[in-house]
């Protein structure tokens, strides 16, 4: 039965989990944490050619207004405490997308003394987007995967 048939009867039944997760997937507000060249591709995903707004994704300037952090680029030891501080300022529930080889595991600079070998050593990561740099399409695919992950989670503890 389609949703139109249910609406003609005057009511719709669902669970609170599905309703809450549906609302969360349609209003992801990421905060950009651009550290290197991957940030340029992240900007490409926000312009009119790819238009992240159609997925309900609106970039926010403040961590207190965001529920998704996109870490794009090489994370250094000096920048790691700032990343953790920004992550801690985000409201719950919060998710992290690691974008690019450098954010995923250090990338080309993996053996450098000043590079953190993956941002998952500082903050918990939900989605990894591979590439050097990953394309805007890859980031959009990662955001869609995050939306699917949010739909599968249980919001209300039982």
From Swiss-Prot:
Q: What is the reaction catalyzed?
A: a quinone + NADH + 5 H(+)(in) = a quinol + NAD(+) + 4 H(+)(out)
How does this chain sit within the bilayer? Answer: Peripheral membrane protein
Cofactor binding comment, as recorded: Binds 1 [4Fe-4S] cluster.
Alphabetical UniProt keywords: 4Fe-4S, Cell inner membrane, Cell membrane, Iron, Iron-sulfur, Membrane, Metal-binding, NAD, Quinone, Translocase, Transport, Ubiquinone
Which HAMAP family does this UniProt record tie to the protein?
A: NDH1_NuoB
Gene Ontology cellular-component annotations: plasma membrane; respiratory chain complex I
- BP GO terms, sorted: aerobic respiration; electron transport coupled proton transport
Q: Which residues bind [4Fe-4S] cluster?
A: 37-38, 102, 132
Domain of life of the native organism: Bacteria
This protein is called: NADH-quinone oxidoreductase subunit B
* Subunit annotation: NDH-1 is composed of 14 different subunits. Subunits NuoB, C, D, E, F, and G constitute the peripheral sector of the complex.
Source species, please?
Answer: Dechloromonas aromatica (strain RCB)
